[in-house]
Amino acid sequence: MATDIEQKVMEAKMASIVLASVDTQTKDNALEAMAKALDANRNKILEANKADLEEAERMKNEGKLSQALVDRLKVTDPKIDGMISGIRDVIKLEDPSGRTINTLELDKGLELYQVSSPIGLIGVIFESRPDVVPQVMSLCLKSGNATVFKGGSEALNSNRVIFNILVEALEDTPGIPKGAFQLMETREEVMDILALDEYIDLLIPRGSNDFVKFIQDNTKISVLGHADGICHVYVDTNADLNKAYDVCFDSKVQYPAVCNAMETLLINREIAEEFLPEMVRRYEEVGVELRFDEGSYAIAEKLGSANIAKATEDDWKTEYNDFILSIKLVDSIEEAIDHINKYGSHHTDAIITENKTKRKQFIALVDSSSVMVNASTRFADGFRYGKGAEVGISTNKIHARGPVGMEGLVIYKYVLLGNGDKVATYAGDTPRPFTHKELDSKLSDIINE
């Protein structure tokens, strides 16, 4: 007999089959209803979040919750505005499902279509951030995927209220199957979800390194995501130092509690004496704790800086998610690239240089899902990449990589349109040859005639 959790997941799986065939206009109508519902229920959301924040502060004071998680938990009116605009941005995006990717004529009257289609049922397990619910639900809905959500206990009230507001809006929209979106709330349900590989097609974990690694290590379901966000900026000998100051400051300080914030600053030794003093001053003004290798420590020590320490080997492997930064001097761009590929997490890394040859070298050799040239690592984000929003950032090398929007929530199927055709015609002693000619026709035009 199925458990309550399995029953909910089965219901979502059945709904995913129906949702895959819902037309774009119906999905867009549902998304607009979701946006309006969030706007109309602001006070309810803020009240629920206030209760979560009070409990989170207590847990932080007891050492059970980090400041980074508390920061991610907070919902404000501007954040609700962001949720609403994010949903409406998804409405503007092209429906990724049902698109003809390629068309190939195998023979006259025998045409093969490669067509995008929803993955099916997505499981989203996340910590702290309540804005994950509208963000991911909108992307999954538009791409035709049903979704099972499991949020962290620290955001229980916020997640529940936001989820219920959105689901009620969907239930009032004709054409959207009921049960396509489910919310799980207890800690025990995580292990149950991880075991349901019979129904769930893809898992997307959003949270700390340990959290994501736990998910990856305890399920047979395919996992889209990244465990670490150890991002670097390398300041080259040919850098415009004014650009370097701005990019390095923004990459660390603009919002340090996220996975695309810089954790290690690499500086070419030739320019360190000129560059580092001003950079240290800017960081110290906002309270960034700095951890230096031997070479950079010697320079910082001359400045009389108080908030400095020597870096250890562990610092190069650490995602701080805080106002902490490790700094290292390197002798060449090759050494910088080697350090990034050894200690980085293949997430986002940047170079500051005006040299075209070094720019090309860095782009080609840094093995990361996003590579920035003279720009902040903080740009590695689905919204900023024009995806409307993102379901997560993937450092995988198959299916989807980097900030993953709706294009990462579809796969494809092959559809062959024939007229009683047989393989026997194209086999044997006198086989008929295939034409294998590319065509411009779209499957949607054919089946909607």
UniProtKB/Swiss-Prot annotation:
This is Gamma-glutamyl phosphate reductase. Belongs to the gamma-glutamyl phosphate reductase family. GO terms for molecular function: glutamate-5-semialdehyde dehydrogenase activity; NADP binding. CDD domains: ALDH_F18-19_ProA-GPR. The keyword Amino-acid biosynthesis applies. The keyword Amino-acid biosynthesis applies. GO terms for biological process: L-proline biosynthetic process. Pathway: Amino-acid biosynthesis; L-proline biosynthesis; L-glutamate 5-semialdehyde from L-glutamate: step 2/2. Keywords: Amino-acid biosynthesis, Cytoplasm, NADP, Oxidoreductase, Proline biosynthesis. PANTHER family: DELTA-1-PYRROLINE-5-CARBOXYLATE SYNTHASE, GLUTAMATE SEMIALDEHYDE DEHYDROGENASE. It is an enzyme of class 1 (oxidoreductase). Its EC number is 1.2.1.41. Disulfide bonds: none annotated. It is found in: Cytoplasm. Catalyzes the NADPH-dependent reduction of L-glutamate 5-phosphate into L-glutamate 5-semialdehyde and phosphate. The product spontaneously undergoes cyclization to form 1-pyrroline-5-carboxylate. It catalyses: L-glutamate 5-semialdehyde + phosphate + NADP(+) = L-glutamyl 5-phosphate + NADPH + H(+). NCBIfam families: PRK00197.1, proA. InterPro entries: Ald_DH/histidinol_DH (IPR016161), Ald_DH_C (IPR016163), Ald_DH_N (IPR016162), Aldehyde_DH_dom (IPR015590), G-glutamylP_reductase_CS (IPR020593), Glu-5-SA_DH (IPR012134), GPR_dom (IPR000965). Its main location: cytoplasm. GO terms for cellular component: cytoplasm. It comes from Methanococcoides burtonii (strain DSM 6242 / NBRC 107633 / OCM 468 / ACE-M). HAMAP family: ProA. It comes from the Archaea.
